[in-house]
Amino acid sequence: MDELLPYPFLALVGQPEMKTALVLALVNPRIGGVLLIGPYGVGKTTAVRALSDIMPNVEREERDDEGKPVLRRGPMRIVELPLNARLEDVVGGINERVALEQQRILLEDGVLAKAHRNLLYIDEINLLDARVVDAILDAAAQGRTFVRRGPMTRLYPSQFALIGSMNPEEGTLRPQILDRFGLRVWVAPLAEPQQRLEVYRRARAFHEDPEAFRERYADELYRLKLEVAAARELLPQVAISAAAEELAISSIQALKIPSHRAEIALLEAARARVAADNRLEVTIEDIVKIAPLALRQRRSLHLEGYAATIAIEDATIAEALAQLGTPAANGRAPRKRAGRAKAGETAKG
């Protein structure tokens, strides 16, 4: 099998939620990325790599042979982060060879610079160094990366669609990292025997003749690529109805979700869905469809308990003050201290 040829995205069996989330992330990077959660062997990495066939063309700044910046248009690329990546590999660092041979400091671009206007994929993100994860998520939120190494500094754009995947059997993510991902997908093993058999049949056909297998889906993939590009163009025109806004915020409050990233993810994903459907307004139905993807795993039982404890403690403090007869506790305004007379006024004695 030619490792350079990705498995066709439309040949994936089942997993409609995963496929929907990945396409929405291509349409609207402001969603905040997608986290795929599931055991080994269920197609997480295969699905992400399959996106290369439907990625739209984008403009990005590159360097010509003389080192001058030029704008070039081409398809988005998938930039994969190695599991053993160091912080310097990600944000950029000093070129050690140049430093040793030429006795000068040269800052090299990191993975985040290469990911600009592309898709950054992090497999097994729960096993990655925490500092590396923080740097990536900060760049994704701010759209730029600042590097300082000794006297050298550099600020470069790093706007990208972010996809992460993990196996929860190997450990979890910190809540503050989990919160940064806009959509969360549980990629469960296929339950239907016929579906599992179809996975085998398609995998075998792809292994035996990848080019012939891909040809079966070529026309549909091309149409999907055009639809993704059209949705990205339409997205700025998509508005949100007042009823949809009200339902989104009411749902988040009813679930007692503390993070304001919840409404960003929910509403931006709903806008992406509408653009993909070639519509111009988010409705209540869009919110209902997207809510599980955007709101799951956002509730914090710890914070709910903490807030309840604070409320009880505040009531206890107020009760203690009331028993002591304090003016504030009894509803009386505190007496003002007599001040000096203002200029031009006579103090009353």
Question: Which residues make up each language-model segment?
Answer:
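Residue-level signal for alpha-helical context at structural boundaries
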Residues: 40, 65-69, 108-109, 154, ...
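Conserved ASCE/P-loop NTPase catalytic core
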Residues: 1-196
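Short amphipathic alpha-helical patches
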Residues: 32, 36, 45-50, 113-114, ...
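C-terminal engagement/docking regions of AAA+ P-loop ATPases
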Residues: 41-46, 250-261, 272-349
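Short, structured secondary-structure boundary patches
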Residues: 56-58, 75, 169-170, 209-210, ...
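Short leucine-rich amphipathic alpha-helices used at interfaces
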Residues: 104, 110, 154, 215, ...
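Basic, amphipathic alpha-helical bundle interface domains used for macromolecular binding and assembly
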Residues: 133, 191-301
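Noncatalytic linker/hinge segments flanking ATPase motor cores
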Residues: 118-125, 161-168, 202-210, 224-231, ...
